[in-house]
Regions:
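Bacterial N-terminal signal peptides that target proteins for export
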Residues: 2-10
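Hydrophobic helical h-region of N-terminal Sec-dependent signal peptides
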Residues: 10-18
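Extracytoplasmic/periplasmic ligand-capture domains
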Residues: 24-96, 106-108, 166-169, 182-183, ...
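N-terminal lobe/hinge region of extracytoplasmic solute-binding protein
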Residues: 101-102, 107-185, 216
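A structural "hinge/loop" feature
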Residues: 133-157, 177, 260-269, 442-448, ...
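Surface-exposed binding/hinge segments that line
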Residues: 230-317, 690-693
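Outer-membrane beta-barrel and related beta-rich outer-membrane complex signature
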Residues: 484-488, 684-686
């Protein structure tokens, strides 16, 4: 057989742009939409006039001080690709400011008695953030664009409501809502200590009771959470949570769980703003939600259901999940820098500063610097990009079309913006994910399934793909042709040249391989027939209006396979939620999406893994794995390596390399273009403190790892 792997030293030509650029990335999973109340909210009114900013303060030095929980940014600048003149990274500071101050908006509310004084709103030990470039001034509005109720990640990413979070480098776990954590030597017992005196955005206390409410009344409730999240299990048993005090939560696992703290910092766990619409998120505003939960409502389930039906919902669980979804329900208290004032179901999704936010800068100014965030609904991506070209947005990377780069450059002075490329190491754009469990789905057909699960067949498809054409037509030639294991500049790269024969255009070898698989017969149109005589047709399922032109890219691949291989194809283009539904039900044979970098292969395994029930490659096998059943062949090896990495922190790095090698060796996904700009960020010229470039990943929720609460507008909105 042709499937032999060559190993060797390979020099990879990198882009000579001074930086490595990237595009508009997708999210790891399709988002669900929570039903809105019957009456649609009116568009948000324009924010109030900006309060006068305090006198400008001297810019802080660009050398970012070292903290206990993060490396000094300057030590990592070169590794991150930061060049001379680039903004350094933000970091946490151990030095508590001698005094604290607040925005004029919060000061006015405190003076009017509508909120407590600042000292009663901040925790005893606030999170202290050293901005990347300079101490900022208060005021202004962050204008953005969004595409509708399924675009929740548009603001979930910058708001990072996780108990712990990552540094800008995307690897170092650091404090956030929680100020510290511990683990025993066996990695079976953990504690997380919250900041004392934390407040929700409505002023109520945030304590471990909010974690235990989620554990006991949400995760454990089958109506809200029929299947507890995979991260909350160890050795087939749920983790045990114990509140040791108002500030200290203890977590015990049946087996060693060395990856748990990293997962808590990542989007996998996150908080209710990110995960609340699905009943997940590790904590929840118990003081608010108890009024909708039958465990706390007089009359129990019957009364809770009656209240839900009166509000237009089928049952209490659906109503409860809506109430816990802050993007759709502005009443829901939040722990983020800004709080929602106008829901995501409106034509204008609006937020305002949270005067109870727990973070300050190194001079004691309560964050965030900007007062408001206003996102205008764009009817489609073309409209959103036209608004960005015209300079209507303050900072916008999401949904920006790289193919319009020349137009953006031409209009940058007129629109008063600059352009940054935020980089995601080892990112695959428009990968082709073959569903190895399609034969187990509702439309599965054994003969075709036998080819989809055959790595030689996938290798032939890969070698029949003309990647250079895809790169030039859709990505301006800014991407690179290669696979996941090509030796790219990535700290998690296996360091071997694995499976790269399969990403080189080689139609002769591909056709010989297909012939050897019994696909040597063709119809009158030159399309290959399966041994039964039925024509082999591969259906490509794609989401429309979702980050990349998946419809166009896959249409090109289908035509390439027809011409180069005699493999017929069909394009199934659906709105994103419908596309996601087809994947969930295992109806899709092949779907196209990005991969969020090698670093996320184990932390967020939905792209490359076979252990996530919402993943792309083998959903049913992932469900089996959650029940202790391993798949056969390479997928079973992937699952065992994953399990070992989760339990044993020392095995993590080596296993991370090996699992991606398995993807490369078995040609799933089939990569098309690698390492293109992930976010082409359009940024007003007077915005400060945005790292350049900002390392990008899904698991660290970029732009959240750039600490947007420290971004500020010199001279206000322009």
């Amino acid at each position: 057989m042709f499937r032999k792997f060559q190993y060797g030293l390979v020099l990879v030509a990198m882009l000579s742009l001074g930086i490595v650029a990237m595009s508009c990335s997708g999210d790891d999973e399709a988002e669900t939409t929570t039903a809105a109340p019957a009456a649609k909210a009116a568009p948000a009114a324009a924010p109030a006039a900006k309060a006068a900013a305090p006198a400008a303060k001297a810019a802080a030095p660009k050398v970012v001080e070292t903290s206990k929980t993060t490396k000094a940014a300057t030590a990592d600048d070169q590794a991150a690709g930061l060049g001379e003149g680039d903004v350094s990274w933000p970091s946490l500071s151990d030095k508590m400011p001698s005094s604290f101050s607040e925005s004029p908006i919060c000061a006015a509310q405190a003076a009017a008695g509508t909120i407590p004084a600042l000292e009663d709103r901040l925790p005893e030990n606030p999170l202290v953030i050293q901005p990347a470039e300079s101490i900022g001034e208060y005021g202004g509005t962050w204008y953005r664009g969004f595409t509708g109720p399924a675009d929740g990640q548009n603001m979930e990413r910058p708001m990072k409501d996780h108990l712990l979070f990552f540094g800008t480098n995307m690897t170092d776990v650091q404090a956030n809502i929680g100020e510290s954590w511990t683990s025993n030597a066996d990695a079976t017992e953990f504690t997380i200590t919250l900041r004392k005196g934390l407040k929700w955005s409505d002023g109520d206390d945030f304590t471990t009771a909010d974690i235990m409410f989620w554990v006991d009344n949400m995760m454990a409730d089958e109506d809200l959470n029929p299947a507890p999240p995979a991260w909350a299990k160890s050795g087939g048993e749920l983790l045990k949570f114990t509140a040791l005090s108002d500030e200290v939560i203890q977590i015990n696992s049946k087996e060693p769980y060395g990856l748990l703290i990293t997962l808590i910092a990542s989007v996998v766990v996150a908080g209710p703003h990110t995960r609340g619409d699905g009943g997940d998120g590790l904590y929840a505003p118990s003081h608010y939600l108890k009024q909708f939960h039958p465990n706390f409502v007089d009359g129990g389930v019957a009364a809770a259901n009656a209240a839900a039906e009166a509000a237009g919902y089928d049952n209490w669980a659906k109503y409860f999940l809506f109430k816990n979804h802050a993007n759709a329900n502005p009443e829901s208290p939040m722990m983020t820098a800004w709080k929602v004032t106008q829901p995501i179901t409106s034509e204008q999704w609006a937020l305002e500063r949270n005067c109870f936010y727990y973070a300050v800068d190194t001079e004691g100014q309560q964050l965030p610097y900007m007062d408001y965030v206003v996102l205008d609904l764009a009817e489609n991506l073309e409209v959103l990009n036209l608004k960005a070209i015209a300079g209507e947005y303050t900072v916008q990377g999401r949904h920006i079309d790289l193919s319009k780069l020349a137009v953006f450059k031409e209009n940058s002075d007129k629109g008063n913006y600059r352009i940054q490329f935020w980089r995601q190491p080892e990112s695959g754009i428009a990968n082709l994910y073959i569903n190895e469990d399609w034969g187990r789905g509702p439309n599965g057909e054994p003969e075709l399934a036998s080819f989809l699960t055959n790595a030689d067949f996938r290798a032939a498809l890969s070698m029949g793909t003309e990647r250079d054409e895809i790169n030039e037509v859709f990505f301006l030639g800014l991407g690179e042709v290669g696979g996941l294991c090509a030796g790219w500049d990535d700290p998690n790269n296996p360091g071997k040249y694995i499976g790269e024969d399969f990403v080189q255009f080689n139609p002769d070898a591909a056709n010989a391989l297909l012939d050897s698989l019994g696909l040597d017969k063709k119809d009158s149109d030159g399309m290959r027939l399966m041994p039964s005589g039925a024509k082999l047709v591969v259906t490509h399922s794609v989401a429309v209006a979702a980050f990349e032109d998946y419809e166009g890219i896959n249409g090109m691949v289908i035509e390439q396979w027809r011409q180069n291989l005699g493999i017929d194809g069909k394009l199934d283009a659906q709105e994103r939620s419908l596309w996601s539904g087809r994947i969930d039900s295992m109806e899709a044979q092949l779907n196209s999406w990005e991969s969020s970098g090698r670093a996320g292969a184990i932390i967020t395994p939905g792209h490359l893994g076979v252990v996530d029930a919402s993943g792309f490659i083998a959903r049913q096998s992932a469900i089996d794995h959650s029940n202790g059943i391993y798949a056969e062949g390479w997928m079973g090896e992937w699952q065992r390596l994953y399990d070992e990495a989760v339990s044993d922190g020392d095995a993590y790095a080596g296993n991370l390399q090996r699992v991606v090698e398995l993807n490369c060796e078995n040609v799933n996904p089939i990569t098309t273009v690698m390492n293109k700009p992930t976010y082409t960020a359009i940024i007003k010229k007077n915005v400060h403190n945005i790292p350049n470039p900002l390392p990008f990943s899904y698991h660290s929720q970029t732009s959240g790892n750039g600490f947007p609460e420290t971004w500020w507008l010199e001279g206000g909105n322009q």
